Amino acid sequence: IENQELLRRALSRSPKCRLILSAHDFHGPFEDITALHRRILTVCPSAIPKLVYTAKHINDCFEAFDLLHRTSGERIVFCMGESGVISRMLAGKLGSFLTFASIDDESATAPGQLTIRKFKELYRGDSVNSEMSLFGVIADPVAHSLSPAIHNACFADAKMNSLYLPLLVKGGSAGFDSFMRNIIRRKWLEFKGLSVTIPHKEDALKFVKANGGRVEPLAEKIGAANTLLITEHGGLHAFNTDYASALDAITAGMGISRADLCDLSVAVVGAGGVARAIVAALSDAGAKIIIYNRTIEKAQRLAAEFGCDWAGPDELPSL
């Protein structure tokens, strides 16, 4: 930008040449991304602005999304870092002129850059468009999750114009609440549903209740939700599918019926969201449950809630 006259002379000699004017911040979001975008176009109206910054939290991505949503023309806007990965995946939906991918993991030129194969095959890069509905799994960590691979393969097979994203939401309940508010107030992102896993299942239930959403009875009983439905008008419905899944997995693995769980002695290790669903399911089936957890207080609270026994991890029988 400091060499405006030099740029003008160079472009005048090559009228078919387009200029990309870039600004990067490797430390965090720009102080004023809108003003920076305007400044680039003021200096060189024919240029393609490229604005790239590091997202320290997934919530930092929304500044980039907002700029793409409220501006037109050719521009390149996305975030670097593991928290900014979804901004690369959504380039096609939000109208970014281009995004970047690497040949392989070793060839990545910036943190958070996807490989070409992962971008095209796992995240349907060639099919992403402005009308696409969005889904995703909220977790911390999330990179290990198979949910994007499973759901995106199903979407492609069913010819559904949908994309399932890995949503790394750090910062406990505060980070979760902020993320949910960000997507709900931006209906144009078209988020339709979310899977929720560790450590946010209890956060999900609390958020839906606090914001006037509908909670299915099973999720209310368990005190955790692993599935959120977002209605057309931004309403929320919370569900818990862990209860039925746990019973099906346990009975199938043991080759027994649900009725056979009655009076069966069962050790449950953990006292988080999944453990709550398993304890609720086994309790309803009549099993005799002992909850083992490193944090004794959490084991005590869960045991008291469902009428179970509890113990510390040092008392867990060797398996």
What positions do the PLM features span?
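Short acidic low-complexity segments
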Residues: 306-319
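Short, solvent-exposed amphipathic alpha-helices that sit
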Residues: 36, 146-155, 273, 277, ...
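Residues at the starts of beta-strands that form the adenosine-phosphate
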Residues: 18, 74, 265, 287-290
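Phosphate/diphosphate ligand-binding glycine-rich loop within oxidoreductases
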Residues: 132-256
